[in-house]
Swiss-Prot record:
CDD domains: Ribosomal_L22. The keyword Transferase does not apply. NCBIfam families: PRK04223.1, uL22_arch_euk. This is Large ribosomal subunit protein uL22. It comes from Pyrococcus furiosus (strain ATCC 43587 / DSM 3638 / JCM 8422 / Vc1). GO terms for cellular component: cytosolic large ribosomal subunit. Pfam families: Ribosomal_L22 (PF00237). SUPFAM superfamilies: Ribosomal protein L22 (SSF54843). GO terms for molecular function: rRNA binding; structural constituent of ribosome.
């Protein structure tokens, strides 16, 4: 039986690491890339708190790549940013999933560090709006794949 999908992360060690992924999420791939960049390298519990603050509109996500026509957010030295609530909720589910996978393996959830998190474009869901005079306007919805790998840090 063929594998349905893989991970872009190489050298996965099942004894020290846990991973999770979500496929075909109906979230923006551009904002997902920005949130993943911000979470990469964080401790897992800190990342969950950060996402809670984004969902509560307390902390914005800085936009480094996809920031054309974005206003600056409050805070000293803070440039373009947004509060991507839908993306934060989806990524939070994946982080909780990887945390549960790590606990199931016997890893300590307080020592988990996000060593890999990535957002990839998924398939486009195509649709049509009927318009006047027999025309139709396309509406396409982007989907996103998220993958996370955490590692237990020895202190």
């Amino acid at each position: 039986m063929a594998k349905r999908f893989g991970y872009s992360f190489q050298n996965f060690d099942p004894k020290r690491m846990a991973r999770a992924s979500a496929r075909d999420l109906r979230i923006s791939p551009k904002l997902a890339v920005e949130v993943c960049r911000e979470l990469r390298g964080m401790m897992l519990n800190d990342a969950l708190r950060y996402l809670d603050d984004v969902i509560a509109l307390k902390r914005p996500v800085p936009l480094k790549r996809y920031n054309d026509s974005q206003g600056h957010k409050p805070g000293k030295g803070f440039g373009p940013g947004r509060y991507p609530v839908k993306v934060a909720k989806a990524i939070k589910k994946v982080l909780l999933n990887v945390k549960n996978n790590a606990v199931q393996k016997g890893l300590d959830p307080d020592k988990l560090k996000i060593i890999h998190i990535a957002a990839h474009k998924g398939p486009v869901l195509r649709g049509w709006y009927p318009r006047a005079f027999g025309r139709a306007t396309p509406f396409n919805e982007q989907t996103t794949h998220i993958e996370v790998v955490v590692e237990e840090i020895r202190r």
